């Protein structure tokens, strides 16, 4: 029987390094280490109650959110996997108030790693897909990293990705040269390329938003969602379906495959806050991926990747997915501002 030829993550990255010359060896190794950490997180997630990792940890993160046991474990896995390899100058996590400098006894590299170790963790105990989101930046030359070193607009990302821990464990990755999806072969322990050059469909009939917050929405979102809900009898003359998983990685992964728009707008409950999702840990990496797949991502007024971060845990409104839909809801926001 002929041996089936499959492209592993390692093979893919080495080929990219040879063909495009835009993937330095240190960055390739860093991505592989992050991918290995995601495999470890996937293992613990899949153990569920058998691994004694479900439930809350009795603590809160810097966002004031109750931490799950798996939140803390996933954060530790990513820190420990990446601190010693010599590829990083520092790390920042949604679960930590301050950035994590590489310990003095380890060599330092030229990259910064930013991550949400376990996105959608409110779904852990009910066995709904959750995931890890990460972003890689260059540390300014010759600098000992400070918080300011991390505060770069999303256009400066050199790589971004997310893992989804669901029926299959998948890793979606961009290094600025398109988007590819790898599926974890649990028997071999390898990430295998299963989707190349992913493209978000331009036309869509699906949208993702938490409709329970409808009474708090601002007029541009009310107008846009109202048109979708009106269906064939409304101005869009087409029926739309709403999908909401409450796990950003799962919602975005569906949109990447089937098209649609993901929305987490600012609302009237907290008018002093520009949104709920974190610019550095969630919005920027997802915006990079979505744009590389032919989609768009804005905060309702401007391109997410152009936003200059002011703090590590800055929040932002998010509209991302199929370009035509993102452009439309963004236009409604801009018209309201006039």
UniProtKB/Swiss-Prot annotation:
The keyword Disulfide bond does not apply. It is found in: Cytoplasm. Binds 2 magnesium ions per subunit. InterPro entries: FBPase_C_dom, FBPase_class-1, FBPase_N, FBPtase. It is an enzyme of class 3 (hydrolase). Pathway: Carbohydrate biosynthesis; gluconeogenesis. One of its GO terms (molecular function) is magnesium ion binding. Substrate binds at residues 119-122, 210, 276. Gene3D superfamilies: 3.40.190.80, Fructose-1,6-Bisphosphatase, subunit A, domain 1. Belongs to the FBPase class 1 family. HAMAP family: FBPase_class1. NCBIfam families: PRK09293.1-1, PRK09293.1-3, PRK09293.1-4. This is Fructose-1,6-bisphosphatase class 1. The lineage of its organism: Bacteria, Pseudomonadati, Pseudomonadota, Betaproteobacteria, Burkholderiales. The gene is fbp.
């Amino acid at each position: 029987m002929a041996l089936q030829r499959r492209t592993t993550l390692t093979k893919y990255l080495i080929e990219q390094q040879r063909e495009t010359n835009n993937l330095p060896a240190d960055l390739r190794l860093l991505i592989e280490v992050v991918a290995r950490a995601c495999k470890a997180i996937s293992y613990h997630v899949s153990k569920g109650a058998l691994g004694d990792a479900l439930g809350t940890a009795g603590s809160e993160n810097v966002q004031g959110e109750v931490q799950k046991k798996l939140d803390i474990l996933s954060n530790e896995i990513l820190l420990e996997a990446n601190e010693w390899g010599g590829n990083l100058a520092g790390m920042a996590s949604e679960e930590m108030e301050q950035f994590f400098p590489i310990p003095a006894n380890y060599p330092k590299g030229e990259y910064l790693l930013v991550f949400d170790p376990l996105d959608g963790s409110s779904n852990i105990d009910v066995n709904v897909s959750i995931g890890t989101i990460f972003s890689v930046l260059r540390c300014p030359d010759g600098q000992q990293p400070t918080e300011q070193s991390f505060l770069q607009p999303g256009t400066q990302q050199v790589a971004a990705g997310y893992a989804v821990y669901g029926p299959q464990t998948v890793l979606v990755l961009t290094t600025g040269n398109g988007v590819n999806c790898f599926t974890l072969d649990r028997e071999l322990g390898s990430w295998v390329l299963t989707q190349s050059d992913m493209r978000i469909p331009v036309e869509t009939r699906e949208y993702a938003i938490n409709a329970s917050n409808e009474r708090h929405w601002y007029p541009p979102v009310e107008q846009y969602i109202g048109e979708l809900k009106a269906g064939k009898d409304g101005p869009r003359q087409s029926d739309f379906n709403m999908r909401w998983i409450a796990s950003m990685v799962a919602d975005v992964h569906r949109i990447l495959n089937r098209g649609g728009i993901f929305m987490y707008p600012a609302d009237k409950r907290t008018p002093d806050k520009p949104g709920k999702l974190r610019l550095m840990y969630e919005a920027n990496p997802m915006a990079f991926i979505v744009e590389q797949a032919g989609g768009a991502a804005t905060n309702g007024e401007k391109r997410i990747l152009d936003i200059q971060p002011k703090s590590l845990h800055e929040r932002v409104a998010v509209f991302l997915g199929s370009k035509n839909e993102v452009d439309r809801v963004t236009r409604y926001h801009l018209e309201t501002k006039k």
